[in-house]
Structures are given as C-alpha cells and as structure tokens.
C-alpha cells in the first residue's frame, strides 16, 4: 500500500521541525504528524509476543519517546515493560484494563504501569498521543520526581520498588492547552536526531507532571489493585 502510494522510501531526508506548534489547531498539528517519517520493521508472520519490551519501541539512547497512537487497530491485550501515558487530544478512545472497559474522552490522560494487561483502541479519526518512558532508567532520569510527597510520586516509587501489580493513574484535564502544548513539543522532539532532543523530552515530561499536579491533583483516579476498584481523591 505505501509503495503504491509513493510513500515508501529507502532513505528519507530530515523533516523541517521549526514551526510554531503551540498555536496550531488540532487539524494543523495532525498534518505535521502525518508528515513525520516512520521507520518500518518487516513482519515475519511469527505470533506477537505478549509482552512488549522497551527496546521494541523506544529508540536507543532515549528515555522518552512519543507517537500518535495508531487508529483502527485490531484488539490485542498486551503488557509492556515501560510506562505508557495516553492523552486524548481530540475525540475519544477505548481503554481496556484488566477486563474492564473505559471510554477516555478529550482531555483525559492515563498513566499505565508496566506489566499491566491492557489495550487502547481508536475506532475513528480521534487523536491520542502515547508517551513511552523507560522503567529501567526512570529513577535516575526523573530523580526529583521520586523525592516528592504526592500520589504521582508514590505511584512511580511503588512500581520501581518491585511492585508488579497492574495499575494506572488517570487525570481529567478538561483539555488544558498547556498540557497539550507540552505533549506536542515532546512529539516533535522525539522526531529530532540531535544530542539535545532526549533531554528536551525529559524536561517536557517534568513540566507536564508538575502542571498536572498543580491544577488537577484533585481529579486523580487511581486503580487500587488491593480494592479491585477505582477511587478518586
């Protein structure tokens, strides 16, 4: 399909990533994402592994990697070894977690712990950005976050100390423009190849976490595996 459409190349030139992404409409930024090159790995027909490893998705020498979540995918409950953050920028998506279904709507953000069996489905032209963060380097990359006394820090500390229970945190941001700007800039930095892009992504993640706690700490919804249910602060 890509070859017939003239979209498959042996080599690609670096895209121009110098625009003013903060003030674009969702449709304008979606076109920018459409123009970003993708590196494809040929599928050999073997069954998909039930657990996605960090190295399967996050490029070498990166601690943070951002993609626009694929649309119209087949259901595939899976686990992975990294933290996944899904932000619904436009529309909605179906979040399946431990046999439960949730519809995430525009402005909602969900942090999924490693080793949690889940799936995320987009069945229309909605836009969801997925932030992948290495678990293996999290405690050093986000050291300042680990020393704070809030539920977000507790969530990460508990997991990094060896708790492998399925878990998630959810924020309801009312589609805050500041959060969206941070994630857009993370997405663009993930597409850059210079020596500064990883550090920039880390900085935007820290800004995003701080903004979430500053404005939306009272909206946190936490999957409590001991209770088997959600509760809100």
Regions found by a protein language model. Give the residues of each.
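A hydrophobic/aromatic-rich effector-binding and dimerization subdomain
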Residues: 8, 19, 41-57, 61-63, ...
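Basic, amphipathic alpha-helical hairpins
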Residues: 185-197, 209-222, 233
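Generic protein-terminus/edge-of-domain signal
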Residues: 1-92
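Short, solvent-exposed loop/helix junctions and linker helices
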Residues: 79, 173-176, 228-229
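A short, Lys/Arg-enriched amphipathic alpha-helix from helix-turn-helix/homeodomain DNA-binding modules
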Residues: 178-180, 201-205, 209, 221-233
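Extracellular carbohydrate recognition
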Residues: 168-171, 198-202
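N-terminal regulatory/effector-sensing and dimerization cores
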Residues: 59-157, 193, 198
